[in-house]
């Protein structure tokens, strides 16, 4: 399955909302909530004696991906395009791989 096919399938189960702002708000709030659930799994493993549950983590990461797909759609983007833009940005920022010096001293306007 391609990234865009996954996005299309995710959108089949998205709520019908009144406008793009509501879609984006729902997507970003959901993304934040699901990311919180993922970090909670790790927190419990590291600090509360729970075993690390990779299957549960994978399911929460799937929920993160679902909300990411919805958020991207709300602003009119396909996930493949967003992923490509991000990789292009990182290649430009770190042409020879990650460099902590370049990370600490990024060029003006480098978002």
Each model region followed by its residue ranges:
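Flexible "arm" and connector segments at domain edges
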Residues: 1-111
